[in-house]
Amino acid sequence: MSELSRLRWLCRRGMKELDVVMSQYLDARYEAASELEKQSFKYLLDMQDPDLYALLLGQEIFPNNDIQSLVITLRTLKNRQ
């Protein structure tokens, strides 16, 4: 299984809202992203759905600036739908 296929599988979450946001980023931005942003995305994919959802809603702020920056990017993509 290629890395992109594996990531696409991991984008399938328990919540439809998360499926959409994570898959949209993977399709639109992942391949052109920096290595640091790719690592941040993989970190987010390893998070539990409620924690990730809280970040995307702005209910929580992640203490790592690189990951928080990606969360803001994900929110921006979500709002463009």
What are the roles of these predicted feature ranges?
Residues S2-Q81:
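Positively charged, polar, low-complexity stretches
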